[in-house]
A protein has these predicted regions:
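Conserved phosphate-donor
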Residues: 44-61, 178-216, 244-267
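Generic N-terminal amphipathic, Lys/Arg-enriched alpha-helix
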Residues: 16-24
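Short, surface-exposed beta-edge/turn micro-motifs
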Residues: 19-20, 158-160, 188-189
């Protein structure tokens, strides 16, 4: 069956410098197995499938797949899917606010002149990382244990463990080696380090993780990680909102996710989204 398809670049103001997302606009009728197979074939970090909502509060529903599994929530797929839904003719109930239904529940999305922003979902795992885990993280990252300023669980779905290093240069210098990981299962690490005051961006972020084959991969720009990092950094007093982050530098990308915080404490993660490829796919 022929289905509408878009490939959207997310989180960069310039095409081809953000994080690409494959979006099957007409996802209804596909099985989970078909969705997973197509997601593996695209070889992108995530692929999404748009579906009719199951609740009247939502404008649309999305299912999000990595190469290996389905996720309840992910950030750049949220913004890219919202962009694709609107570009395909979707009309929200509220012109300035779109509500996405996904595995994590309902996610409100703002639309503004700079792009889209989603409300950071609650963390499902928080708290400090134990000493044994810190040792393992240092080994995987190829750095001394003393170079880790702090490490915290910051999981909003994918399983992120956040690692704070002394500065942005330290983050960019890391050469991860997941063959040193002895903890079993997958490992999703978010690295963050500050730029000097007055720089274009406040923080450098990297997302490194093991894929379904145990190989190391790096995500160009990661909304879910930037969301959980912002929640941690703001709550701990290490950051103040609004701020601009940088991600994808080591991959030759120019990701620029922005962070805002409402008076009630809600954290928003935003960025541009640009359709780079559109057409049909046989599924």
């Amino acid at each position: 069956m022929r289905r509408r398809f878009q490939q959207v670049d997310v989180f960069s103001p310039e095409p081809f410098l953000g994080n690409p997302l494959a979006v099957v606009v007409d996802g209804e009728g596909l099985s989970t197995e078909q969705m997973q197979q197509f997601s593996r074939w695209t070889n992108l970090s995530e692929t999404t499938f748009l579906l009719p909502p199951t609740t009247p509060e939502a404008d649309y529903r999305v299912r999000i797949f990595t190469l290996a599994r389905e996720l309840p929530f992910a950030g750049h797929p949220t913004l890219g899917s919202c962009h694709a839904w609107l570009a395909a003719g979707g009309v929200p109930r509220d012109a300035g606010r779109i509500v996405q239904e996904c595995g994590a529940g309902l996610v409100p999305i703002r639309r503004g002149e700079r792009g889209f922003a989603f409300a950071a979902p609650p963390l499902i795992r928080t708290g400090p990382v134990d000493g044994v885990m810190v040792d393992q993280l240092a080994s995987v990252l190829g750095i001394g244990r003393g170079e880790i300023v702090d490490a915290q669980w910051a999981d909003n779905g994918p399983g992120w463990v956040a690692v704070l290093l002394k500065d942005a240069d330290a983050v960019l210098a890391v050469e991860p080696d997941f063959s040193r990981w002895s903890g079993g299962g997958s490992l999703d690490i978010g690295l963050v380090g500050a730029y000097p005051p007055g720089a274009e961006c406040a923080w450098e972020v990297r997302a490194v993780f093991s894929d379904d084959q145990g190989a190391m991969r790096e995500d160009p720009v990661t909304g879910s990680l930037n969301a959980s990092l912002a929640q941690w950094l703001l709550a701990s007093g290490r950051a103040t909102a609004p701020y601009l982050a940088s991600q994808g530098t080591r991959l030759g990308r120019r990701g620029r996710p922005w962070i805002e915080q409402d008076a009630d404490g809600t954290v928003w993660v935003g960025g541009p989204a640009i359709t780079c490829i559109q057409g049909d796919v046989e599924l």
